[in-house]
Amino acid sequence: MSQLSSTLKRYTESSRYTDAPYAKSGYGTYTPSSYGANLAASFLEKEKLGFKPVSPTSFLPRPRTYGPSSILDCDRGRPLLRSDITGGSKRSESQTRGNERPSGSGLNGGSGFPYGVTSNSLSYLPMNARDQGVTLGQKKSNSQSDLARDFSSLRTSDSYRTSDGYRASDGFRIDPGNLGRSPMLARTRKELCALQGLYQAASRSEYLTDYLENYGRKGSAPQVLTQAPPSRVPEVLSPTYRPSGRYTLWEKNKGQASGPSRSTSPGRDTMNSKSAQGLAGLRNLGNTCFMNSILQCLSNTRELRDYCLQRLYMRDLGHTSSAHTALMEEFAKLIQTIWTSSPNDVVSPSEFKTQIQRYAPRFVGYNQQDAQEFLRFLLDGLHNEVNRVAARPKPSPESLDHLPDEEKGRQMWRKYLEREDSRIGDLFVGQLKSSLTCTDCGYCSTVFDPFWDLSLPIAKRGYPEVTLMDCMRLFTKEDVLDGDEKPTCCRCRARKRCIKKFSVQRFPKILVLHLKRFSESRIRTSKLTTFVNFPLRDLDLREFASENTNHAVYNLYAVSNHSGTTMGGHYTAYCRSPVTGEWHTFNDSSVTPMSSSQVRTSDAYLLFYELASPPSRM
C-alpha cells in the first residue's frame, strides 16, 4: 500500500501533473479529469480503509460487531464511489489531507440498541412514551456480567404454533396474547427464553412477508443481495450497550391495509403547533445509532428542515431525469413526522432505512457503520434526486489558465452549477482552492474543487487539548512535496520539489467539519481521544479564505458524537433547536435537555456549523 499523502494522490494520480494539466500547458483546463474525476479520486483515498474480507490467507483481524451481519460484512470501511451514484457527475466528496490509513475502518458505531429491537414496524407513526413499557433503568439493577450471562444463555426454537400458543424448546408455553410484551418484562428465565423465541419466530415470518411484498412482484427483482433477518440481537451485551429504548417493541398500526405501510403527510400546521419542537426520538433498528445521530443533526438544520416541512422539495423532484425519488420523499416524511410529533414520542425510521440501503447497498443489514460515510451517501442521494439540472451538458475543453485565480474560481463554480444544482448543494457545498508551486521556477498552478465537508487532522500541539483553529491551520498549512512525492512541473518539464497549500475559495452555508480521530500507527488503527476545543458561536474562518471576505463566521448547531473504539461504539447527537435555541441530547429514542456547557466533549466527531447572518449595513 502506498504511503503517499492523500493530498498527493489528488495531485499525482489525476492527469493534472503527469499528463495534460501540469506537465503540459493546459493545466486548469476544465475537463472531467481536471475538475471532476480528481474529486472522485479524493473519495477513493482510504482515509478510513475498510476491513479486508477474511480469507484463509488474510492475517488482518476481523472487526467485532455486536449485531447480526450480512454478506456485506467485509465491506465495512470507507466506500468506493459507485457508478450508479455518481453517474456522469464526478463531484468531490469530503476534502481531506493526511497519510493513508492502515487497515482499519472509521468510527463504527451502533451497538447501543435495546434488547429485542426489530425493524418490522413499517411506518413513521410515533409511539407515546407513556405506553412504551419498562426500561432497564426502572428494573432492579444487575451487574453487566450477570446480564451478559443471562442473555447469552437464551435459546430459541424454530418451531412455533399460531393457534394454541408458542411452545419454546423447554416446553414453556406462552399465550399469543403476550406477543406485545417485551422480553425485558419476563419474570423468569424460562419465560424470558420463550418470549425471545416468540419474537424471533414472528420476526422471521414478518420479514419474509415484507420481502415478498416488496420484491416478489412479477417482473421485479430485489435490488439488494441479501438482508439479515432484523430480529437477531447480540448474544452478549456490548461494552457500550445503552438501554435507550422505551417503547413497546411490537406495537402495530391497527386497521392498516396489508402491504408495506407508508406514513401519511402531517395534517396540522407544523409551524404554529406548540408540540412541533422536533424533540421526537428515533428507534434504534439494530446498530443504527450512526444513522439516528445524523438524522437528528439534519433535522435541526434550519433551512433543510423548512425545505421538507414546506414541501419545497416537491417542485424540484420533477426536474431530475431520474425516476428514483423515494429517498428524498421518505427523508422529507421522516423530518415532517419528527416535527409534528409530541416531545418524548419515538419514531421508527424503518422505511427511510429501506430507501437508503437501496441507494447505498453497503448499509444493508445491521452492521455498525461510520456516521461520516453515511452522511456523505445520504447527501449525495438527496442531491441527485432534487438536482435541478435535467440534462448535464458535455464538458468543454475551455482553458482557464490565462484567467486570474479569482475569475478562474468563479468560472469553475459556474461550470459546476451547470451540472450539479440542488437545494442540498446550495446548503452544504463549498469550494476549495488547491495551489502547487514549483520551488525552482516559481510556476504556480491552481485548481478549484467543490467539497461537501472538510476532514481535519487533529493537531498534536497542545496535547491533551487542541483547538479547532489548530486543526484548521494544520489542514491548510503548506506541505513540501519532495523525493518520491515530486510532481512534474510543466514549465521545467521535470519532476521538481513543490509546495502545496489549501484555502477556502467559497464558504458553504452549512459547514460540516469531520475530526479525523485516527492514530498514525501502521500496525493498527486506533481512535484518538484528544479533546478538541471548538467554539459554539463566532467561529471566524476568514484567515483561511483564498480572498478577502467578511462573511466567514459560523455558529455551531449540532454535533455527532462517538463513544467507543474504531471497532465498535455508540453514536449520539447534541442539537440546538432552530425554534427555541435550546440544546438537547438525542440518544436514539431518548431525548433530554442539556446545557450548552456540556456540548464540548472528547467524543465530538462531526461538527455542524451554520453561516452567521452578515452584519447589517447602515
From Swiss-Prot:
Cleavage is inhibited by ubiquitin in a dosage-dependent manner. Cleavage is blocked by ubiquitin aldehyde. Zn(2+) binds at C438, C441, C489, C492. Residues 255-274 have a biased composition (Polar residues). Residues 90-100 have a biased composition (Basic and acidic residues). It catalyses: Thiol-dependent hydrolysis of ester, thioester, amide, peptide and isopeptide bonds formed by the C-terminal Gly of ubiquitin (a 76-residue protein attached to proteins as an intracellular targeting signal). Residues 54-112, 246-274 are annotated as: Disordered. Expressed in mesangial cells of the kidney. Isoform 1 and isoform 2 are expressed in elongated spermatids; the shorter form appearing earlier than the longer form (at protein level). Isoform 1 and isoform 2 are expressed in early round spermatids of the testis. Isoform 1 is expressed in muscle and heart. Isoform 2 is expressed in muscle, lung, heart, brain, liver and ovary. It comes from the Eukaryota. Its EC number is 3.4.19.12. The different N-terminus extensions of isoform 1 and isoform 2 determine their respective subcellular localization and differential effect on myoblast fusion and accumulation of muscle-specific proteins. The different N-terminus extensions of isoform 1 and isoform 2 are not essential for their catalytic activity. This is Ubiquitin carboxyl-terminal hydrolase 2. It comes from Rattus norvegicus (Rat). The gene is Usp2.
